[in-house]
């Protein structure tokens, strides 16, 4: 598996190519789960100050992946993690996940949590390989047979400013 040459940065979610990528993720989830089991963070919420929204772009600047960390004090939640289907298998998901973990650790987060779907086998495998363990629902989530809730501890790391490269 060749590792993609990427630039991962904090960006706003308003660029047309990023909006298109987010919509692809929503369409993918809609094919797998009913609306009540889809928990996408709305586009407007990605602009809030407690959200760190990252975009992975290739050497030509094409948006290939997104991910967000929503800060909640000592813990954070991963949201909107999506890799364009045509670019999967190149290590992009792991790179953006590592960047999200670094961003959360830099913000002082000690526990990182997420919710994903039971049919999202690639995501589940990645999260398990990177140390996430299954747990009960958290925050406002309710038990859902189509959802998997996970968490992993983090070490605090230096944070990066908006627009700076997180991975190259």
Q: Across the structure, where does each feature detected by a protein language model lie?
A:
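Acetyl-CoA-dependent GNAT
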Residues: 3-79, 84-86, 97-98, 103, ...
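Conserved catalytic-core motifs of GNAT/GCN5-like acyltransferases
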Residues: 13, 113-116, 124, 128, ...
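A generic structural signal for beta-strand entry/edge sites
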Residues: 73-75, 111, 147
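Active-site acidic-Proline motif in GNAT/NAT acetyltransferases
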Residues: 84-90, 118-119
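Conserved GNAT acetyl-CoA-binding A-motif
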Residues: 97, 104-115
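Cationic, low-complexity basic patches in intrinsically disordered or flexible, solvent-exposed regions
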Residues: 162
């Amino acid at each position: 598996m060749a590792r993609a040459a990427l630039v991962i940065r904090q960006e706003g979610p308003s660029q047309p190519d990023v909006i298109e990528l987010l919509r692809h993720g929503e369409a993918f989830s809609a094919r797998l789960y009913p609306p009540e089991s889809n928990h996408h963070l709305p586009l407007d919420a990605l602009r809030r100050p407690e959200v760190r929204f990252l975009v992975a772009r290739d050497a030509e600047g094409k948006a290939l992946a997104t991910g967000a960390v929503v800060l909640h004090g000592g813990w954070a939640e991963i949201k909107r993690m999506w890799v364009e289907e045509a670019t999967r298998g190149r290590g992009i998901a792991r790179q953006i996940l590592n960047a999200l973990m670094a961003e959360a650790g830099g913000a002082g987060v000690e526990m990182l949590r997420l919710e994903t779907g039971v049919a999202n086998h690639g995501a589940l495998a990645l999260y398990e390989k990177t140390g996430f363990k299954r747990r009960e629902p958290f925050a406002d989530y309710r038990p859902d047979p189509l959802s998997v809730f996970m968490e992993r501890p983090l070490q605090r790391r230096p944070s990066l400013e908006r627009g700076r490269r997180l991975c190259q």
